[in-house]
Curated annotation (Swiss-Prot):
Biological process per Gene Ontology, one example term: L-valine biosynthetic process
Name of the top EC class for this enzyme: lyase
InterPro entries, sorted: Dihydro-acid_dehy_C, DihydroxyA_deHydtase, DiOHA_6PGluconate_deHydtase_CS, ILV_EDD_C, ILV_EDD_N, IlvD/EDD_N
Function description: Functions in the biosynthesis of branched-chain amino acids. Catalyzes the dehydration of (2R,3R)-2,3-dihydroxy-3-methylpentanoate (2,3-dihydroxy-3-methylvalerate) into 2-oxo-3-methylpentanoate (2-oxo-3-methylvalerate) and of (2R)-2,3-dihydroxy-3-methylbutanoate (2,3-dihydroxyisovalerate) into 2-oxo-3-methylbutanoate (2-oxoisovalerate), the penultimate precursor to L-isoleucine and L-valine, respectively.
Reaction equations catalysed: (2R)-2,3-dihydroxy-3-methylbutanoate = 3-methyl-2-oxobutanoate + H2O; (2R,3R)-2,3-dihydroxy-3-methylpentanoate = (S)-3-methyl-2-oxopentanoate + H2O
Cofactor(s) the record lists: [2Fe-2S] cluster; Mg(2+)
Assembly description: Homodimer.
Protein name per the record: Dihydroxy-acid dehydratase
């Protein structure tokens, strides 16, 4: 066993002495040591219940024949961190989570790891650590929040509150109406109830084969999640016995299939960043063009908030992620159904008994919302290395958008401009110097996109940025523009009034300025001074790579 490194032989007597002090009994020294990587944090609704999950996991591990050791990671609540300096720590927290988990796993030579993530950066950070250390692993997330409800029974989510702020500022909603939404949109623990980043990643974990069916959609308050934990613990012990490791499960075909599910469900654009980072840890080279190739063969089957009013709970009762995966298995060439998973069985075997029970919530393959997937990678002279848009959350009437640039050098400036009414129909809002390096930390733009929607401009204004978006963002919102402004990318040289053309069917974004004019503007450009000059963000900005490579850290 891997853990023999710290418990076998005469030289390890001091180590065993410390293990005894930690509560390990003599008869337990020969059993597998299992790390329980938890992310319990009081201030994050998606994590406030995970202390109880860890207790269930540890008991299940003991019953399955292992010895559990719980440790914790940090986490950032993107909703609470939104719109201020806190958001600059969100994406960088992914790297801390990964590094911290790697540190504990390798320092203590665990034989296996039971990961308990939930919200936005925690799930990918933990999976990156799992793949990096390549120790047998299983994942059970904390589960989605129940949807809020209006008095007339309409679903609410956190996105409803953000968009309500925009509606209030433009006079379309009263303070009392906004307060009612604020008080009812987030009624329970769990990750926010729509197809935002957390639920996108937790759903993808099922397709990646690192979590059991139900992981993405069983609500946090359901006892069924406890059974999921118990089942996963048994599978973990089997993985250790058979020496099935994360890199046996995570292959290039697995990454393809993760994007296929993303396309079918119209997942968050952040999944592109995170899945590329996971591929990087698995030493898989993955070209952005491959994502568009996946989109061409996968239909858009399930619209969830913010693209509709359906919640993750609605998806669960319609058959869950498993039913969507099964539907994709029945489309020739859509996914690779024979891939191995943590059950020791193929992805198809995991979902073969799943059924769509509500084909309004989950459409069948012969009646999709669109014959192509809900995410697109755009290329053009404004984004030579790519940009991403959640086309599934764009009004279907918008195929081509051409407008005049209105340029802001920070999210805060843009928010003020939108609130002041400076942004009008026909504008392309440009928010730059907000990329991984320039932000630093590539903050999310949920506040500006929500303000645009709330002011009734969702089909009349586009927003482009080298930053990124919350999974709750919708509309003509294009992020991850690469190279970013801080690296001298084309977005750094856009001026007010420049024409920008977005062609969704052809997946292009073009800056309608002559090459001569672009070259003239680029003359004499120098890299701007970093916004943060001490602490973690200063180090991060020096080491982080571009969005098109997943925003990982250079070694």
């Amino acid at each position: 066993m891997r853990s023999d490194m710290i418990k076998k032989g005469i030289d390890r007597a001091p180590h065993r002495s410390l293990l005894r002090a930690a509560g390990v009994k003599e008869e337990e020294m020969d059993k597998p040591f299992i790390g329980v990587c938890n992310s319990y944090i009081d201030i994050i609704p998606g994590h406030m219940h995970l202390n109880k999950f860890a207790e269930v996991a540890k008991e299940a591990i003991r019953e399955a024949g292992g010895i559990p050791f719980e440790f914790n990671t940090i986490g950032v609540d993107d909703g609470i961190a939104m719109g201020h300096i806190g958001m600059r720590y969100s994406l960088p927290s992914r790297e801390i989570i990964c590094d911290a988990a790697e540190t504990v796993i390798n320092a203590h030579w665990f034989d296996g790891v039971f990961f308990i993530p939930n919200c936005d950066k925690i799930t990918p950070g933990m999976l990156m650590a799992s793949v990096r250390t390549n120790v047998p692993s299983v994942f059970v997330s904390g589960g989605p929040m129940e949807a809020g409800r209006t008095k007339d029974g309409k679903n609410l989510s956190l996105a409803s509150v953000f968009e309500g702020v925009g509606a209030f500022s433009s006079g379309k909603m009263t303070r009392e109406e906004l307060l009612e939404i604020e008080q009812t949109a987030c009624p329970t623990c769990g990750s926010c109830s729509g197809m935002f980043t957390a639920n996108s990643m937790n759903s993808l974990m099922e397709m990646l084969g690192m979590a059991l069916p139900g992981n993405g959609t069983i609500v946090a308050t359901s006892e069924a999640r406890h059974q999921l934990i118990k089942d996963a613990a048994k599978h973990l012990m089997n993985l250790i016995e058979k020496d099935i490791r994360p890199r046996d499960i995570i292959t290039k075909e697995t990454i393809d299939d993760a994007f296929a599910l993303d396309m079918a469900m119209g997942g968050s654009t952040n999944t592109v960043l995170h899945t590329l980072a996971i591929a990087n840890e698995a030493e898989i080279e993955y070209d952005l063009n491959r994502i568009n190739e996946v989109a061409e063969r996968v239909p858009y089957l399930c619209k969830i908030s913010p693209a509709s009013d359906y919640s993750m709970d609605d998806v669960h009762h319609a058959g869950g992620v498993a039913a969507i995966i099964k539907e994709l298995c029945e489309i020739d060439g859509a996914i690779h159904p024979d891939r191995i998973t943590i059950t020791g069985k193929s992805i198809y075997e995991n979902v073969k008994d799943a059924e769509i029970t509500d084909d309004v919530v989950i459409r069948r393959k012969d009646n999709p919302y669109s014959p192509v997937g809900g995410l697109s990678i755009l290329f053009g002279n404004l984004a030579p290395n790519g940009a991403v848009i959640k086309v599934g959350a764009v009004d279907p009437s918008i195929q081509i958008f051409e407008g005049e640039a209105i340029v802001y050098n920070s999210q805060e400036e843009a928010q003020q401009g939108i609130n002041n009414g400076d942004v009008r129909e026909g504008h392309v809002v440009v928010i730059r110097y907000e990329g991984p390096k320039g932000g630093p930390g590539m903050p999310e733009m949920l506040a500006p996109t929500s303000a645009i929607i709330g002011r009734g401009l969702g089909t009349k204004v586009a927003l482009i940025t080298d930053g990124r978006f919350s999974g709750a963002s919708r509309g003509i919102s294009i992020g991850h523009i690469s190279p970013e402004a801080a690296e001298g990318g084309p977005i750094a040289f856009i001026e007010n009034g420049d024409k920008i053309r977005i062609d969704l069917p052809n997946r292009t974004i073009e800056w309608l300025v002559s090459d001569e004019e672009i070259a003239k503007r680029q003359e004499g450009w120098t890299e701007p001074e970093p916004k943060v000059k001490k602490g973690y963000l200063a180090r991060y900005s020096k080491l982080v790579t571009s969005a098109n490579t997943g925003g990982v850290m250079k070694i």
